[in-house]
Curated annotation (Swiss-Prot):
GO terms for molecular function: flavin adenine dinucleotide binding. NCBIfam families: mnmG_gidA. The keyword Disulfide bond does not apply. It comes from Latilactobacillus sakei subsp. sakei (strain 23K) (Lactobacillus sakei subsp. sakei). Its main location: cytoplasm. Keywords: Cytoplasm, FAD, Flavoprotein, NAD, tRNA processing. Gene3D superfamilies: FAD/NAD(P)-binding domain (3.50.50.60), GidA associated domain, C-terminal subdomain (1.10.150.570), tRNA uridine 5-carboxymethylaminomethyl modification enzyme MnmG/GidA (1.10.10.1800). The gene is mnmG. NAD(+) binds at residues 276-290. NAD-binding protein involved in the addition of a carboxymethylaminomethyl (cmnm) group at the wobble position (U34) of certain tRNAs, forming tRNA-cmnm(5)s(2)U34. FAD binds at G15, A16, G17, H18, A19, G20. Belongs to the MnmG family. This is tRNA uridine 5-carboxymethylaminomethyl modification enzyme MnmG.
């Protein structure tokens, strides 16, 4: 193919999924001339698997993206068809919002946002090779021969990277949802010294909603109480006309159909070689691994208002199509369901994430960034968070500003990226609340208090929104201070209230804040006995109640975070020679050499690096010379 010089951009983003959309929008909004290149303009921010966003940990990531000035939260608030707050019976650290998306409206709305964003050009094309000179990425070449030069390139090719779809005995080269795969880009990465591995994910069948007998299933409606992903969205915009999801179950017949055909299941015949996601196994994998379970939950989720397609959740499979028909028809409510699309597995290339810096710039090629499923993660939310960070850091580097890195105590996005670049991953990485050491600080409700100031400093949060944030922050602080000054006396009314709640009576006067700390006392109860603040926002009330009730636990986490910050402040010289440091264990030395951690705290989280290694390294850094260990 004859090449030609097409154009120059400050930033080129390859791939317009959830990572690419956020990366391109961030770079453009920070004033960089940006090209967003996608294989198919009709698949911008598409949802090839579950038509939903959020859930435990992942929902908090969407809030963090919004607090930093990203688009995902605003986009889903405009296009959801159901909203539910999960884990409401548990503590605030694990509460999470989940939205059922109209996947087609989500795509259209995000595409329109991209098309109307200043400094951002959206174009269809297939990137086939990187332009690399002296270890520095200078642009890309497309399949039509167009040479686009750039100061930074961000790759977000997702599961299209040398993608291969598998349905039973059938295998063929493809990206997600039967899109065009990206083959030569993977080859270009390998030619430039990158180590790639193969992962696998899957998706369930889609069925025709008009052929489902919903009377045999359990309805799951949305919440009536307003909730939103974006801090910009007012409660008045909350959708009242929500669509329900539905729940049914597999049974003995389903399990027998699967067991009888395991000899045709790619998961067990060796056809699938890529490593699959631990926390989203296929239904055939679940039947084998959990043989004692009599049934498994199945969720029937609408894919939008203008379609009858239903996503059969928790039923991912790569069984042959004819077997998928039998599996579906064995399930209550789906006896006569017509399958519109079969489930499939897809294998794809992943850049081993130890080759990345915390900014998501690669260590192998300068000015080249990767984000999303290319880095070994699963999920739209994890991809979007990485894309946002890659776009921000590409823009910052070009303008000579310091890199933007969130640490583990600041955001789930920080936990995600630190896990990737420090520990790597041997399977598709899913963000879980259990991965965060400071999850009481990383809540759904306080993402704006954690990150809005940072988003404003980056230029991604405008002044009007920042002013609204400061008003909320001041209101929270004022109410917390007020409750520390008001005293309640053991009046007959208060004692009767406490008795009705099963709480111990007051013996003496007590501060309003201490009264609120009682497990059965809500803020709404408290203001029966003290003057109410007129017009106080319910989000302020939520914040006050959580901060008061969990003050002791929050203070403990703050103390741990202060210790972490001290370790993060101990920078490791970029040119350090680990071979020159006597006393390091062999495994620790090898891991440190491979990962090249930037701080002592990051080094301490590397698997195989023991506390003694950290002690030796700490002495070396402090003394600035080789640590002698007897």
């Amino acid at each position: 193919m004859r090449e030609y010089d097409a154009a120059h951009y400050d930033v080129i983003v390859v791939g317009a999924g959830h990572a690419g959309s956020e990366a391109a929008l961030a770079a453009a909004r920070m004033g960089r001339e940006t090209l967003l290149l996608t294989i198919n303009l009709d698949m911008v921010a598409f949802m090839p698997c579950n038509p939903s966003l959020g859930g435990p940990a992942k929902g908090i990531v969407v809030r963090e993206i919004d607090a930093l000035g990203g688009q995902m939260g605003r986009n889903i608030d405009k296009t959801y068809i159901q909203m539910r707050m999960l884990n409401t019976g548990k503590g605030p650290a694990v509460r999470a919002l989940r939205a059922q998306a109209d996947k087609h409206a989500y795509h259209r709305t995000m595409k329109r946002t991209i098309e109307t964003t200043e400094h951002l050009t959206l174009r269809q094309g297939i990137a086939e090779s990187l332009i690399v000179e002296d270890g520095v990425c200078k642009g890309i070449v497309t399949n039509t021969g167009a040479r686009y030069s750039a100061d930074s390139v961000i790759l977000t090719a997702g599961t299209a990277s040398r993608g291969k779809i598998i349905i039973g005995e059938l295998t063929y080269s493809s990206g997600p949802n039967n899109s065009i795969p990206s083959i030569k880009l993977s080859e270009s990465l390998e030619d430039n010294g990158f180590v790639l591995t193969r992962f696998k994910t899957g998706t369930p069948p889609r069925v025709d909603g008009t052929t489902i007998d919903f009377s045999k299933t359990e309805e799951q409606p949305g919440d009536k109480e307003p909730n939103h992903f974006s801090f910009e969205t007012p409660d008045s915009a909350y959708l009242k006309d929500q669509l329900s999801c539905w729940m049914t179950y597999t049974n003995d017949t389903t399990h027998q159909v699967i067991r009888d055909n395991l000899d045709r299941a790619p998961m067990f015949t060796g056809v699938i070689e890529g490593v699959g996601p631990r926390y989203c196994p296929s239904i055939e994998d679940k039947i084998v691994r959990f043989a004692d379970k009599p049934r498994h939950q199945i969720f029937l989720e609408p894919e939008g208002r203008e379609t009858e397609e239903y996503y059969v959740g928790d039923f991912s499979t790569s069984m042959p199509e004819e077997i998928q028909h039998k599996m579906i028809h064995s399930i209550e409510g789906l006896e006569n369901a017509q399958m519109m699309r079969p489930g499939y597995a897809i294998e794809y290339d992943v850049v081993e994430p130890w080759q990345l810096k915390p900014t998501l710039e690669t260590k192998v090629v300068e000015n080249l960034y990767t984000a999303g499923q290319m880095n070994g993660t699963s999920g739209y939310e994890e991809a979007a968070g990485q894309g946002l960070m890659a776009g921000i850091n590409a823009a910052l580097k070009q303008t000579g500003r310091d890199p933007f890195i969130l640490d583990r105590s600041e955001a789930y996005i920080g936990v995600l990226i630190d896990d990737l670049v420090t520990k790597g991953t041997k399977e598709p990485y899913r963000l879980l609340t259990s991965r965060a050491e400071y999850r009481l600080m990383l809540r759904h409700d306080n993402a704006d208090l954690r990150l809005t100031e940072k988003g404003h400093e980056l230029g991604l949060i405008n002044d009007d929104r920042f002013d609204s944030y400061e008003v909320k922050k001041a209101a929270v602080e004022a109410e917390l201070a007020r409750l520390e000054k008001i005293r309640l006396k053991p009046t007959p009314e208060i004692q009767a209230f406490l008795a009705a709640k099963g709480e111990a009576p007051l013996k003496d006067g007590v501060l309003a804040s201490d009264f609120l700390k009682r497990p059965e006392v809500k803020y709404a109860d408290l203001i029966q006995f003290i003057p109410a603040v007129e017009g106080i926002d319910n989000r302020v009330v939520e914040q006050v109640e959580i901060q008061v009730k969990y003050a002791g636990y929050i203070d403990k986490e703050k103390a741990k975070i202060a210790k972490l910050k001290r370790m993060e402040a101990k920078k490791i010289p970029a040119n350090i020679d680990y071979d020159a440091i006597e006393g390091l264990a062999t495994e620790g030395r090898q891991k440190l050499q491979k990962i090249q951690p930037e701080t002592l705290a990051q080094a301490s989280r590397i698997g195989g690096v023991n506390p003694a290694d950290i002690g030796i390294l700490s002495v070396y850094i402090q003394q600035g010379k080789i640590a002698k260990v007897k």
